């Protein structure tokens, strides 16, 4: 009973932002993140696209508020005889220099048995001493991942196979005056605010659909599935620091955005002000209740 009461209580959005910032949701591999959202939101369900969706109210008009979950990342593209992994970048929109952020960094490989820590190798400074520097910038094609395996069998024993998702290791960092730094911190903080707002909102007349959508970076499949399955909508609110225009809005209606101020966007230290997450949850709660 106590555990049930905890689930029914609205979570504190700032600590939840830190928690979500420590999770990984590579485009096309958001299932674990969706599982967590479903646990946090009693009554929410997984739709055919893989979104976590909570429907409030009934009838017209219908409105949608959506927060994207996905992030740029990689999959295991090859497993060498010596146990090293090679990578392919997952398709979709990515920030500039995304591959260069990978070189020499800790990564997490998500295998059948869960998270496997690993590292992306760098050139040996001893073996390359006296040679000219690399002319071309580092790319995913030059990445070799070491997870401590000595051969293919040890890779398999770790639960890692081809197409296993790979992303930078998540180590959310709090610094300064209530600042949170982590990859895609803006999206994670926005989704935390929406989870909190969804818990105790009183929806306006009609239907309000709250969706945590997948594959936004690739084809907006999650958002478009929500539009086709639950729309048409008169209004849509996107909780996302990405300001890319929605050109095929169709039945999304009037599209607006809510976002936190983000510094160093698209980098491993993307930074958001944690003290602004609770006010964002308040604005989202007001929107769900029929406010502008």
Kindly label every feature range from the protein language model.
Residues 2-292:
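N-terminal hydrophobic/helix-forming segments and targeting peptides
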């Amino acid at each position: 009973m106590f555990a049930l009461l905890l689930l029914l209580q609205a979570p504190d959005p700032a600590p939840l932002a830190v928690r979500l910032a420590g999770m990984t949701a590579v485009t096309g591999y958001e299932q674990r993140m969706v599982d967590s959202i479903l646990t946090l939101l009693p009554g929410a369900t997984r739709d055919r696209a893989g979104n976590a969706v909570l429907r409030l109210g009934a009838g017209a008009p219908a409105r949608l508020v959506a927060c994207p979950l996905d992030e740029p990342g990689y999959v295991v593209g090859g497993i060498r005889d010596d146990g090293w992994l090679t990578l392919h970048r997952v398709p979709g929109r990515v920030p500039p220099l995304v591959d260069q952020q990978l070189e020499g960094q800790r990564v997490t490989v998500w295998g059948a048995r869960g998270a496997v820590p690993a590292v992306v190798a760098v050139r040996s400074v001893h073996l390359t001493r006296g040679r000219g520097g690399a002319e071309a910038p580092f790319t995913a094609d030059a990445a070799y991942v070491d997870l401590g395996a000595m051969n293919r069998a040890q890779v398999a024993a770790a639960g890692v196979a081809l197409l296993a998702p790979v992303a930078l290791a998540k180590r959310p960092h709090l610094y300064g005056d209530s600042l949170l730094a982590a990859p895609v911190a803006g999206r994670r903080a926005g989704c935390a605010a929406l989870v909190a707002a969804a818990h105790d909102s009183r929806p306006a007349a009609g239907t309000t659909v709250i969706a945590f959508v997948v594959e936004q970076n690739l084809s907006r499949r999650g958002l478009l599935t929500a539009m086709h399955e639950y729309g048409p909508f008169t209004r849509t609110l996107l909780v996302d620091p990405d300001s890319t225009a929605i050109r095929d809005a169709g039945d999304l209606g009037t599209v607006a955005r809510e976002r936190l101020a983000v510094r160093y966007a698209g980098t491993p230290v993307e930074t958001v002000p944690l003290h602004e997450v609770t006010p964002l949850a308040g604005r989202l709660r007001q929107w769900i209740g029929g406010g502008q």
